[in-house]
């Protein structure tokens, strides 16, 4: 399953991040493979807002389609 399929309120575990530049950027933001995050919002246009601890990160729909997850 990919992150773009997560519904608001779902807690998910990140299985695989896109490689290269995107992966490095997520790691800088404190998000890595194996982390548990909350899908806190789904915005118009497909943007997904995830929350880890008290930090929220908005992820565009194209990038969300490249992030593999599993529901908890």
Model regions: which residues?
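Compact, glycine-rich, soluble single-domain proteins
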Residues: 1-72
